[in-house]
């Protein structure tokens, strides 16, 4: 499986009720998944936990057979080889502009990455 969630909970400080509770799912590489539900049901919280932008309070998230989140242990978002595009987008605030641009440039030489970053910065 490419993505596996096992009994994932997401909790926000000061909130009695979890934003996400006991979610389990699996997706194979190339498979498309859809999250639907009313506003406030936890869709964005779950996606943020998968992307590493929110810690999980229980359960675990596995990407490409590697555990990337579980209670007390979360791989940084830039090490997950995935990202999200939000309606109100933002960059990774802890990365430089160049590193934000390079985030999606996997499998390229440093020279090719530098060239692409320079190209994008000229736009």
Language model feature labels by segment:
Residues 51:
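Helix-to-loop junction immediately C-terminal to a conserved catalytic motif
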Residues 13-14, 95-113:
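ABC-type ATPase nucleotide-binding domains, specifically the catalytic core motifs of the NBD
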Residues 3, 18-20:
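Conserved structural motif at the start of ABC-family nucleotide-binding domains
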Residues 36-38:
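The feature captures the beta-strand-to-loop junction immediately N-terminal to the Walker
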Residues 57-68:
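ABC nucleotide-binding domain "signature motif"
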Residues 67-83, 107:
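ABC ATPase NBD coupling module
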Residues 66-70, 111-123:
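Conserved ABC ATPase "signature" region
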């Amino acid at each position: 499986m490419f993505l596996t969630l096992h009994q994932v909970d997401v909790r926000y400080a000061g909130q009695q009720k979890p934003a996400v509770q006991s979610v389990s799912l699996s997706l194979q590489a190339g498979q498309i998944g859809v999250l639907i539900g009313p506003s406030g049901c936890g869709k964005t919280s779950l996606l943020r936990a998968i992307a590493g932008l929110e810690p999980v309070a229980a359960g675990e998230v596995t990407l490409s057979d590697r555990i990337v989140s579980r209670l007390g242990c979360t791989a940084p978002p830039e090490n997950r080889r995935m990202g999200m595009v939000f309606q109100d987008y933002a960059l990774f605030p802890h990365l430089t502009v160049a590193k934000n641009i390079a985030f999606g440039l996997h499998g390229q030489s440093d020279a090719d990455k530098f060239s692409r970053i320079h190209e994008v910065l000229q736009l």
